[in-house]
Amino acid sequence: WQRPLVTVKIGGQLKEALLDTGADNTVFEDINLPGRWKPKMIGGIGGFVKVRQYEQIPIEICGHKVIGTVLIGPTPANIIGRDLMTQLGCTLNF
């Protein structure tokens, strides 16, 4: 069983990300996004982490374009959460 890794274009930059139906939010690490951000706390595996929340970020996944909220902060892997997957109409059935 392999993790569903996809290449996504986020704010014009290409990144590898993990499709995660267990995650509510989309979280990336080491990426610079334009515009204003606001601080947010999210619960992760190791407790709560402070992240930067960017709104209205263009994201392209496998040719599908969506505009959504992206969180930037420390994460073990770049994660596409349910918030964007529902916009894509993407379901993962295991």
Residue ranges and their predicted role:
Residues W1-V8:
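Charged, flexible boundary elements
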Residues K9-F94:
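Aspartic protease
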